[in-house]
UniProtKB/Swiss-Prot annotation:
InterPro entries on file: Snake_3FTx, Snake_toxin-like_sf, Snake_toxin_con_site, Toxin_cobra-type
Membrane-spanning ranges: none
Residues covered by region (Disordered): 1-23
Signal peptide (residue range): none
A Pfam family assignment: Toxin_cobra-type
Alphabetical keyword list: Acetylcholine receptor inhibiting toxin, Disulfide bond, Ion channel impairing toxin, Neurotoxin, Postsynaptic neurotoxin, Secreted, Toxin
Molecular function via GO: acetylcholine receptor inhibitor activity; ion channel regulator activity; toxin activity
Organism, as annotated: Naja kaouthia (Monocled cobra)
Disulfide-linked positions: C3-C24, C17-C41, C43-C54, C55-C60
Family annotation (Gene3D superfamilies): CD59
Tissue expression summary: Expressed by the venom gland.
Name of the protein this chain belongs to: Cobrotoxin II
Length: 62
């Protein structure tokens, strides 16, 4: 599986997921600098107030 892994509004980059990982995620939240976005492999649990979208196809998390 190939997932996007750039932060916030950086130029899109991708990474190959290892260990049989079959999810990509896009996590979004707001802090004192504005809206933040994190992307990567897996589907982590998140704290209240953080939005997450997990998906299972190549580059689905942009």
């Amino acid at each position: 599986l190939e997932c996007h892994n750039q932060q916030s509004s950086q130029t899109p980059t991708t990474t190959g997921c290892s260990g049989g990982e079959n999810n990509c995620y896009k996590k979004e939240w707001r802090d004192n600098r504005g809206y933040r976005t994190e992307r990567g492999c897996g589907c982590p649990s998140v704290k209240k107030g953080i939005g997450i979208n997990c998906c299972t196809t190549d580059r689905c998390n942009n």
